Amino acid sequence: EGKATLGSYSVDLPANFIFIGTMNPETSATEKLSDVFLDRFDIIHMGYPETIELEKQIVVAKGQTLQVAFPDDLLTFALMFVRLLRDHKDIQKKPSVRASIGIYERSQANAFLSKRKSVTAQDVTDALISVLAHRLELKPSAKYLQSADDFVGEQFKNFLRDHPDFEENGGEGL
């Protein structure tokens, strides 16, 4: 108590601080935390945002804007697709909120590079595979049948089939 040790170095630390750390449970660091450490920590488990509206607030607050508007209905649609992937039975490592932020930023970058002031449905479509494929991991039963790129593309085609208004309206009025 009152000391921190790293390797052979020990440092006296007053006990008037709060330590906050993060860890993804599916990937441990170089060493798992010992029982001694675990006994000194409170652990809070956090899942994905419970609603699309909450996730949208996080994405807009944390994402870069490039002064390019992202229509609200279009962002909702993109987040609906991410949430669909999170619930997919063949995905072992689910797309995180960072993936949602990545879609937001990449879609805006696509519009910006095309010299437009607003994101279109095509900007979102063009962003999905490059943003999502490397952020998810398919279960062994699925990853030997198709690549993550093909999987995301196929799931998006299925999603579009179930939401025909997306392409018909260019993402408007979903």
What is the predicted role of each segment?
Residues 35, 52-57, 72-76, 122, ...:
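Generic alpha-helical secondary structure signal
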Residues 56-119, 123:
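Conserved AAA+ ATPase small/helical "lid" subdomain
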Residues 1, 27-30, 34, 38, ...:
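Signal for well-folded cores of large energy- and translation-related assemblies
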Residues 18, 46, 61-64, 101-109, ...:
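Short amphipathic alpha-helical patches
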Residues 1-66, 108-110:
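Canonical AAA+ ATPase core
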